[in-house]
UniProtKB/Swiss-Prot annotation:
Protein name: Non-specific lipid-transfer protein 1
Keyword line: Disulfide bond, Lipid-binding, Transport
Organism: Trachyspermum ammi (Ajowan caraway)
Transmembrane spans: none
PANTHER family: NON-SPECIFIC LIPID-TRANSFER PROTEIN 2-RELATED
Function as written in the Swiss-Prot or TrEMBL entry: Plant non-specific lipid-transfer proteins transfer phospholipids as well as galactolipids across membranes. May play a role in wax or cutin deposition in the cell walls of expanding epidermal cells and certain secretory tissues.
Length: 91
């Protein structure tokens, strides 16, 4: 099973970017987005999606459009979107 704490700690270096925009840090891309990618390629994509969505919802100032752009900004292909409004059942 996927531990949401892993997702939370992976996204931590990305919080300044997710709430403020600009450019994500190397830590955010290398540790954060890559960790989520590694988790989401398992058979537990729906669980990973729910963890990412829950983490996103903990930050009321998170900018959804910035969050959705994060994988592209880091040049990482993610199968699950980083968003507060993702329908994880559709994944």
């Amino acid at each position: 099973a996927i531990d949401c704490k892993t997702v939370d700690s992976a996204l931590l270096p990305c919080v300044p970017y997710l709430t403020g925009g600009g450019t994500p840090t190397t830590d955010c891309c290398k540790k954060g987005v890559t960790t989520i990618k590694d988790i989401s390629v398992t058979t537990q994509q729906k669980d990973a999606c729910n963890c990412v969505k829950a983490a996103a919802n903990r930050y009321p100032t998170l900018k959804d459009e910035v969050a959705r752009a994060l994988p592209d900004m880091c040049k990482v292909k993610l199968d699950i979107p980083i968003s507060r409004t993702t329908n994880c059942d559709a994944i």
